[in-house]
């Protein structure tokens, strides 16, 4: 009799344990499938730009987009400037080698990431420029400086794109919502002159609020001289025969058009 009761108790205990295990499993599955926890640490743009610390982090991210394939000077094998002279490089380098560039044995895939990083930086800079004025922890001088730095960076990213890809799309400064239709986000290429004029005007505007020099802690940030120097270089390149066809050479870029047949390079010599 007692043995029968013992079996009953065991079955009851086993049933309770089974129910608890199933309940815990359902609960854990519910927690696993819940995505709310992934959004708890996401900040709104308003919260970010009301905070001095978060705003500085946002600006730092803009500068971060100058790294990797956007570096002007870097270690051997990772920048085209490394192959601009007759210095000897180790051919066992795992990246693109000296001879690959010397003999033209490369394609567009090597610099594709630069295109992505530039437009990422352009978007980051535009968002900062459009929102930083709500910050109450920064002084007016700091806000003007941060906006000017972002403006410099945005223009510089376009300069990098122009040098590598020629005429590129100029993205609206109010930025593009990811919720828009794909076709609404597909902006056509702007002409070479349009991109140059944008860079020139934005660099001149940035120079008005940038300081002439910075302290040691901020020595790598943009300055008035940097903005004016980039602007001068852009205009110098634009005035060269490569981009400004001389009389008698007007058909040089006659077939350089977009899908709508719009000319992307000027066909008229500009003395200015």
Regions found by a protein language model. Give the residues of each.
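A solvent-exposed, charged loop/short amphipathic helix patch at secondary-structure junctions
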Residues: 246-269
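Sec-dependent bacterial lipoprotein signal peptides
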Residues: 10-27
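Conserved, well-structured interaction surfaces
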Residues: 51-70, 74, 91-165, 183-219
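Single conserved hydrophobic/aromatic residue that forms the stacking wall/gate
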Residues: 1-9
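Aromatic-lined, polymer-binding surfaces characteristic
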Residues: 218-228
